[in-house]
Design a protein with these regions (language model features):
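Acidic, Ser/Thr/Pro
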Residues: 2-162
């Protein structure tokens, strides 16, 4: 009787250990792929911006890291611009401009920027690497990223509300 009880105890401990290790493995696998996307041509992914309006100072940013030069269209904002940049992409006006804060003046630019260009209802990005876009608003809204290239696009994207 005692030997049978010990055998059941060992079996139970072994099964518990296997379940815990499997859970850790699958959690790790899930966490590694968090924020990584692959879109086929024409497919889209939506990202919700939830500003922390209850804070005195708040801002939101879209961190977009691309490993290739495939074209992705970003839509959902009226004006797009990178953090720490002075170039603004006005979607509604269909104008690019450089803001000069010291002179309180805007210089209009041609729509032929190398990595980002203006389209009808958004911007198309084709750079390789990481860029951070300022996406702060005073209410929640959705940003849509669409693959407008003819091949699958692999990227990492994350909206951070601070």
């Amino acid at each position: 009787m005692n030997l049978k009880r010990k055998s059941n105890w060992n079996l139970g401990c072994s099964l518990t250990l296997v379940v815990v290790l499997a859970a850790i493995f699958f959690f790790n696998l899930w966490a590694q792929n968090l924020g990584k996307y692959t879109l086929q041509p024409g497919e889209s992914a939506n990202f919700t911006v939830n500003p922390r309006t209850h804070d005195v100072e708040y801002y939101s940013e879209l961190i977009l890291k691309k490993n290739d030069t495939n074209k992705l269209k970003l839509s959902g904002k009226k004006v797009w611009f990178e953090m720490n940049s002075d170039i603004f992409y006005g979607v509604e006006e269909q104008k690019l401009f450089r803001r000069n804060l010291s002179e309180n003046d805007d210089e209009e630019l041609p729509n032929n920027q190398k990595d980002i260009h203006l389209v009808k209802n958004g911007i198309v990005v084709s750079y390789q690497g990481e860029k951070v876009f300022y996406v702060t608003n005073n209410k929640s809204y959705t940003i849509t990223i669409t693959n407008v290239d003819d091949k699958p696009a692999h990227f990492e994207a994350q909206v951070v509300d601070r």
